Amino acid sequence: MRKIIHVDMDCFFAAVEMRDNPALRDVPIAIGGSRVKRGVISTANYPARKFGVRSAMPTAMALKLCPHLILLPGRFDAYKEASVRIQEIFSRYTSLIEPLSLDEAYLDVTDSLHCHGSATLMAQEIRQTISDELNLTASAGIAPVKFLAKIASDLNKPNGQYVITPDEVPHFLKTLPLSKIPGVGKVSAAKLENLGLRTCEDVQKSDLAMLLKRFGKFGRVLWERSQGIDERSINNERLRKSVGVERTLADDIHDWSDCETIITEQLYPELERRLAKVKPDLLIARQGVKLKFNDFQQTTQEHVWPKLNKDDLIATAKKTWQERRAGRGVRLVGLHVTLLDPQLERQLVLGL
């Protein structure tokens, strides 16, 4: 039996904004386009949700519901950076990671030895680590299959988790509304209700041939989900565009020799290991370094390089240290590579 964790960040874009500007924490905010441009809301914080503001809502409607709503245009570089760090935390527990977007992912921890193999404890640790290292909260669902883990992650939001053990699956499905199954939208739910199908138990009692006749392939998927069947594996190639590793230091460092030691003894070996799991012996697009200073400002430096190269990374880090540190202590050191687009990589490899 598999152990699947679905991690979903809590109002992610808005949470990053509130973290970086605490004055926004208790006021209604939303990330989205302006009313003039007929934009839509990407996400809203919980104070805004109390007024009925929701994701995918037209901005004009959101402002009618909450006239004092603060609209923010979005800082996608900041969201991407936080997402990369979250993925790095996931990778401490398993290499079987399937990102669904910047703020959610599936993890298969079936064979992980962390926390004595307990997926529940791993989910707790992952959420706590995200809170400690990024000052953001996440919710999680734990189940033996993907779709149930995704449903479970929404049952104890925000900043909570819900476990569906294999023994609990039949009871959980008995009263589960079909509208909760990922992929069942409002239109499909209405069609199913017209047939008297509202819960998974209703589908369990129905004829598969009838479902196939009326809904085709979707009918089979619906029947399988209602039985608790979901054989999809983790697709860990999905959206994977970079590999990185970084360390937040217990004490600020001021000497380049300390930084070089961290890179050569800790970061580079770990980066090699992670890259080997994703793209062994294949080309990369760029590699680079990141330094964060004790005033919380940070800088990155990268350039085109076809293969992972320790000497080049050390030289890049030293140049960045000398030119941008300005006497400040360094509290975080990171290395990363940007992966080559698969189609371009294939063209280059075939041309060699």
UniProtKB/Swiss-Prot annotation:
Gene Ontology terms: biological process: DNA-templated DNA replication; error-prone translesion synthesis; SOS response
Subunit structure: Monomer.
Catalysed reaction, written as an equation: DNA(n) + a 2'-deoxyribonucleoside 5'-triphosphate = DNA(n+1) + diphosphate
NCBIfam families the record matches: PRK02406.1 (NF002677)
Site (Substrate discrimination): F13
Name of the protein in its database record: DNA polymerase IV
Residues bound to Mg(2+): D8, D103
Presence of keyword Lyase: no
Cofactor note: Binds 2 magnesium ions per subunit.
GO MF, one annotated term: damaged DNA binding
Gene Ontology, cellular component aspect: cytosol
Gene3D superfamilies, per the entry: 3.30.70.270, 3.40.1170.60, 5' to 3' exonuclease, C-terminal subdomain (1.10.150.20), DNA polymerase, Y-family, little finger domain (3.30.1490.100)
Cofactor(s) the record lists: Mg(2+)
Primary enzyme class: transferase
